Amino acid sequence: ATSLVAEFRSFDLIVAVTGEWNVDVLLCDLQSRKTGIPPIIFGWVEPNATAGHAVLLDSSDDTACLRCGFSDSGRFSRPVTKWPEGAEMFQEPECGAVFSPYGPVDQAWSQALISELSINTLVGRATAKDYHIWVGRKDRVEQLGGDWNEEWISIHGNPELGGRVIKTSWMSSASCGARHETEAA
């Protein structure tokens, strides 16, 4: 692990899009401990790829903490969309496998969002805690059985028909715990 951290220091940027919460927490913790790793862009999609997120966190900002926006188990606290239980995943007939019905076209919006933030970071046009949100089309969300999340609307406003990018700053939470424990250590 020590050699991996040393190798990270030679990078200009880390883009974390694995969807593995434990990996994201490790990267967040390494950065908060001022280990010299570069800025990190975390990216993820919501169910059915109907919304996407990209956040830039940099150790130059002591309040930059990915965990502030997630539960301890990695559930995002402010999704754009909401879904009835079970509507996010479908089961294949005659098989135990489950899947979310989206593909490359649906993901393209989120990939572009993450790519744009990555390029802006590398050329110096982004700052720590930049947070970009792709809000998919309302008709697609409704077609798949979802809706806009009222809590998200109360913070960011009604996206109406969707199909837009929102640029804001990443949240900080005094109740985050994990971030504040590493600062006290």
Short names for language-model regions:
Residues 1-3:
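S-adenosyl-L-methionine
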